[in-house]
Amino acid sequence: MSACRTRRTRTVRRAGFTLALAAGIAALSFAAAQSAAVTVVETGSTLIYPLFNSWIAAYAKVDPGLRMTAGATGSEAGISQAIAKQVQIGTSDAYMSDNQAMANPQILNIPLAISAQTVEANLPELRGTPLKLSGPVLAGIYSGKVRDWDAAPIAALNGGVRLPHHTIVPVRRAEGSGDTFIFTQFLTFSTPDLHLQATANILYDWESRIGYGTTVSWPSVPGSLTASGNDGMLQTIARTPYAVGYLGISFKADADKAGLEAAMLENQDGKFLLPTAATITAAAAALTPRTPPDERLTLAFAPGPDSYPLINYEYAVVSTRQPNPQVASAISNFLLWCISPQGGSAASLLDRVHFIALPTAIRALSEIQIAKIQ
């Protein structure tokens, strides 16, 4: 999904729908159903990859006959390979674009959980001191309009903090990425109409100039770096003093061990927050009730004083048309297990990667979609 969007598509994906919950969803049967040596291949999101590996290991006790492999290739690859039938399950932090959905009506976007991103900075002078950043300031950094850590826009957010006079090194993903999709949504939705404001000479009108997507036309910033996957982002930020970059929350523990500092991000209500179970849940509660039947919805930059602004659905991208009933049944049962609080969405699994489970109403929508897999 290389085309980026500059219009406010969030109003299309967020408004005008009501939850269409079908009665009579059958009780989950994953515990009783077992596969006869069925092989399923997953690839895609590096954000969900650590959790997916945990799911595979745990589900092997439920269905020993299912042989499943997982790959961390990036969300764009997860979507494209699922569409091309190269894999049975693509995973993605991004939903398919409207054009992709229209061209591939047999492809489902099924939320499995809710995750988030952090913005990590490598500032040796500020170890243990939370840094405050906003969408407009990050847009300025990633456009090259804000070049130094002690620049006025950053200093204005961090009163009383002695910021280093060093050039900022922005780090971004090299490949098509759902993390890029989420991060650029945050920049897009938090910087509307800056060309009409007095700050236009300092910041950057990301919404009209760049927009969002799994791949975007990044502004050229001298000294900026690229990295592949969340693991590559973590390593690059950690070894580069004065770097900043976006990271899937499933890598939070590794970022902490590397001595990186997660920034407090400004939300719609002007509050600066870190991603916690409470702030991710608050953001989800603000927007998930607007989820349409196809479940393609932007969760970034949710309203509410307690809403962390960088969250998303984690999607399984799956075709309704499987090669045979055995494969269809194996995939369906596995996905039902993934979203069940008694299965893959148990706190013991989600807490390890700082994800939260789907709300009950959204789980019901995902069950409706899973029932279409044949």
What do these predicted regions represent?
Residues 1-12:
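N-terminal secretory signal peptides that target proteins for export/translocation
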Residues 13-16, 299:
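Hydrophobic alpha-helical segments with strong N-terminal bias
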Residues 5, 20, 32-33:
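Intrinsically disordered, low-complexity serine/threonine-rich segments
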Residues 16-29:
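Bacterial N-terminal signal peptides
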Residues 33-374:
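Flexible loop/hinge segments at secondary-structure junctions
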